[in-house]
A protein has these predicted regions:
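Anionic-ligand anchoring segments at beta-strand to alpha-helix junctions in alpha/beta enzyme folds, i.e.
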Residues: 17-78
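Short, surface-exposed, polar/charged, turn-prone segments marking secondary-structure boundaries
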Residues: 49-52, 78-80, 108-111, 130-134
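Hydrophobic/aromatic residues located in beta-strands of well-ordered beta-sheets
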Residues: 50-52, 103, 150
């Protein structure tokens, strides 16, 4: 059974990690890529070694956010974190070797299957980017690069703020990201 963590507990746990590999889902969208890129940059700001597992399905739209974070082929992680992934069947093929090693899942899907040792879930969030924003700002300063990645995450999963899942909280987070 996965331990449920609050945002604060998640940030505290992330501070204990190093050599982190971050996983995104198949057919990666802006939410999974933006969250992974933001988390990677936040961990690096703390002096941690962190990378994203290269996702073979990424499109040219999202590649610029992810490319600076891609893991080198010889990287051996000490910790594996998934973002915006509700179930293991959403992992790309190259992530399957890590499916039993995921120490933390950060997500917003009510269908979350709690496959990781720990899970930070906010099923009321319109995007995983909302959850990640709260975690990152608890961890470190939100830099312009982090803000841009999180804005991509939030705007993507809300259909540029027109989907019914968009809330006042969504707009407050987007505004805060724009102010960085």
């Amino acid at each position: 059974m996965s331990a449920r963590l609050t945002v604060r507990e998640t940030a505290d746990f992330l501070r204990t990690l190093d050599n982190v590999l971050i996983l995104t889902h198949v057919r990666p969208d802006g939410d999974t890529v933006g969250c992974a890129a933001a988390l990677c940059r936040a961990l690096r700001a703390l002096g941690k070694t962190a990378y994203m597992l290269p996702n073979p399905d990424i499109t040219e739209t999202y590649e610029p956010y992810a490319a600076p974070c891609w893991a080198p082929e010889d990287f051996v992680p000490a910790a594996v974190v998934s973002v915006d992934i509700a179930a293991l069947n959403l992992l790309p093929d190259n992530a399957l070797p890590y499916k039993g090693d995921i120490c933390l899942a950060i997500d917003h899907h009510g269908s979350q299957e709690f496959f990781a040792a720990r899970t930070c879930l906010d099923a009321d969030a319109a995007a995983c980017g909302e959850v990640m924003y709260e975690i990152v700002r608890t961890l470190t300063e939100v830099t312009p690069d982090i803000a841009l990645a999180l804005y991509v995450a939030v705007s993507t999963d809300t259909g540029c703020f027109v989907y019914a899942n968009t809330t006042a909280r969504t707009h407050r987070i987007a505004a805060a990201l724009m102010d960085v």
